[in-house]
């Protein structure tokens, strides 16, 4: 499927919950998009990612470039052209949305104008852009935290803002939002065996998260070839879920669509045309 010469879309895998697409851009860079549960499209915002999370395939090759607004919109239009009406869109694929602020903010506005609810997932930095995005016309903002201790955060989200600075910004900015808008903000915690799954780490995370009054997405890890990290066992995952609930948090478990090897969280990949040494983020 060709979308106005901006990109081509090829379906490469299908399962009970997800349909996975390779998106080839005009310069032959490639990213991926996923249709979850038949009505939610996860789009990519960059070719690669500079945040360098060790558990995620999207940034394994570094960052090539950010996508343009036409390239973001074309992902939506190309899927709809296949006869697949979309109930919602999320900018949660390859890339860090806050590293492509102009295009992604314009994309959120475009989605709103056409009546398609749009959300995004971010590692939270740069922090001034997080402040800007929280008040943007989104239908959901998920901030990936993955840690209760600063050292763990630095290890798992090495190019994102530090834990204390991140929660400091959230603690300052969330009270400025309306109650309705605050309910659209959530935190994400990916549970990794031997990395961030101890009771002490979870308690520390809960102590930071509780005052914010937002929900927590407790994610299961999807194995990827570029990472040696492993997800916690199902028993440990359920234990963490119960602990966070006992700590007073509203916790949501991973949906089946998000834990499939076919397009689940952290599995999307990119292939860019720029050398890794020329990695950059847009202004």
PLM regions: where:
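Conserved AdoMet/S-adenosylmethionine-binding subsite of the radical SAM
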Residues: 79-243, 247
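Classical nucleotidyltransferase
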Residues: 221, 244, 251-264
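SAM-dependent transferase fold signal centered on methyltransferase-like domains
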Residues: 2-7, 20, 51-52, 74, ...
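Canonical Radical SAM [4Fe-4S] cluster-binding loop centered on the CxxxCxxC motif
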Residues: 36-71
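Residue-level signature of catalytic and energy-coupling elements of molecular machines
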Residues: 49, 216, 265
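Flexible, acidic/Gly-rich N-terminal and inter-domain linker regions that tether
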Residues: 1-39, 43, 280-283
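Short, solvent-exposed polar/charged micro-motifs at secondary-structure junctions
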Residues: 8-13, 18-22, 129-131, 196-197, ...
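Radical SAM enzyme core and accessory elements
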Residues: 4, 258-283
């Amino acid at each position: 499927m060709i979308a106005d010469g901006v990109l081509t879309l090829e379906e490469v895998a299908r399962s009970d919950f997800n349909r996975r697409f390779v998106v080839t851009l005009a310069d032959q860079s490639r990213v991926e998009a996923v249709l979850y549960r038949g009505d939610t499209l996860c789009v990519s915002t960059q070719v690669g990612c500079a945040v360098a999370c060790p558990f995620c395939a999207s940034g394994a090759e570094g960052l090539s470039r950010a996508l343009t607004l036409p390239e973001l919109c074309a992902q939506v239009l190309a899927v709809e052209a296949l006869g697949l009406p979309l109930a919602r869109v999320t900018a949660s694929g390859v890339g860090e949305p806050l590293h492509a602020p102009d295009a992604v903010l314009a994309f959120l506005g475009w989605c709103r104008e056409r009546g398609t609810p749009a959300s995004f997932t971010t590692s939270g930095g740069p922090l001034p852009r997080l402040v800007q995005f929280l008040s943007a016309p989104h239908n959901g903002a998920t901030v990936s935290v993955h840690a209760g201790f600063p050292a763990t955060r630095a290890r798992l989200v090495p190019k994102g803002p530090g834990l204390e600075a991140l929660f400091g910004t959230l603690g300052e900015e969330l009270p400025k939002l309306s109650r309705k808008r605050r309910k659209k903000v959530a935190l994400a915690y990916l549970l990794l065996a031997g990395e961030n799954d101890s009771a002490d780490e979870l308690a520390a995370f809960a102590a930071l998260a509780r005052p914010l009054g937002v929900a927590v997405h407790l994610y299961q890890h999807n194995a990827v070839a570029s990472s040696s990290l492993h997800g916690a066992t199902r028993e440990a995952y359920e234990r963490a879920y119960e602990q966070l609930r006992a700590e007073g948090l509203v916790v949501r478990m991973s949906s089946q669509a998000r834990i499939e090897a076919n397009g689940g969280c952290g599995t999307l990949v990119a292939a860019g045309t720029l050398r890794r040494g020329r990695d950059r983020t847009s202004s």
